[in-house]
Curated annotation (Swiss-Prot):
It is found in: Cytoplasm. The keyword Cytoplasm applies. This is Peptide chain release factor 3. It comes from Neisseria meningitidis serogroup C / serotype 2a (strain ATCC 700532 / DSM 15464 / FAM18). GO terms for molecular function: GTP binding; GTPase activity; translation release factor activity, codon nonspecific; translation release factor activity, codon specific.
Amino acid sequence: MSQEILDQVRRRRTFAIISHPDAGKTTLTEKLLLFSGAIQSAGTVKGKKTGKFATSDWMDIEKQRGISVASSVMQFDYKDHTVNLLDTPGHQDFSEDTYRVLTAVDSALMVIDAAKGVEAQTIKLLNVCRLRDTPIVTFMNKYDREVRDSLELLDEVENILQIRCAPVTWPIGMGKNFKGVYHILNDEIYLFEAGGERLPHEFDIIKGIDNPELEQRFPLEIQQLRDEIELVQAASNEFNLDEFLAGELTPVFFGSAINNFGIQEILNSLIDWAPAPKPRDATVRMVEPDEAKFSGFIFKIQANMDPKHRDRIAFLRVCSGKFERGMKMKHLRINREIAASSVVTFMSHDRELVEEAYAGDIIGIPNHGNIQIGDSFSEGEQLAFTGIPFFAPELFRSVRIKNPLKIKQLQKGLQQLGEEGAVQVFKPMSGADLILGAVGVLQFEVVTSRLANEYGVEAVFDSASIWSARWVSCDDKKKLAEFEKANAGNLAIDAGGNLAYLAPNRVNLGLTQERWPDIVFHETREHSVKL
């Protein structure tokens, strides 16, 4: 271990933003970049002419619909730290891609629409974070509007999400009467003014909740605030760093992302409290972030980030050591050495060549089809990082094309989209039609649009009478062959070459499992691990 690597690892913070759709996640992403100095005004990257679309929403379908469909990666410096921010799809139909992104972070920022409280997608995503005890910071957004009672919101988070809340700031009013927040730990009041371009130093601060100036500023509100703070301090949890790092307690902040209010406090908490890169599990051993040798894993593949180049980028989370441009690294699944000369880092779709990267950083490797999600890279050691799952799809469609001459383009397009995780592709063992599996309907719309725009293929999706999929495996090859022969009509091969059972309904799946006790039916499978 070198002191240089240790110092660089300590400076890193890698986190994702998770939320239900429309809670204000993309707005918050923009504002974090604005406050860090990474961009000059929300929606435009510093020095680049990117139009008026959000920095992190770069795919055409995202621009049309105003949702984050793909996960983007943004790196910026703040307070002598390097921050890697992973923006995740907020739309409920994109949970599988979001799950995978959560395997590449060390902490998460949960955004809640304070008018609505805890919503379905938030519950799913927090459950994924809980699998890895990921520390969570919470931001209650939209206090410039009429919202629900703040104590009620804390109770809801604790009861539904089963994580204890420690309010760090507390709101003064809401909607038209929103005056600001009181910072409980700092004993300061930050005064709210509407306006999306206001920067941190432009908000007024009053020191001390007993400051006489507050009677002049808020003659009607100040006594209620003091009473509320007394109640909150008596009834809620104090912030405890160890409990936060264990994923048991979440610090809670209140504000209005669209008005830049409450953003700096969140950034400071992520720098001061969130963990630096942590050790990662691999099949042979635990890999420490400050080891001398480079290693990392692929958690996402994005096709055609640059429409002009029609390329694919594999997103790699660095787990240990130091990456240097031009170094040789081994692609372990196929046992091939590659010279990493054109590796990039991101500000959404704006790319810069990487000279060096450390644990916690996300780098992009140009991919011509050899790299898959879950692949591990090292300087030679046979490491395979674990914990990057595929989830069983919930919706299925058969796919056909209007122009049979374009069958090769269809197959190529679906292969690429399958590899990047936009959709799961199954080739039935009997029958010609390919079957697509997804977590939500919008994924099929995205695939239709991308097949047309990127591959020139007009595809038609028909409903498929499939209830769910299970990957199957068996140690006894003879038994597996018998199972395949008896169930050929329900079996398919996925994009990774794995055998899957496509069940028409719940009863069928249950009966099949009973009839074949030696066959293991898996609801998830590890990426790049052949069952």
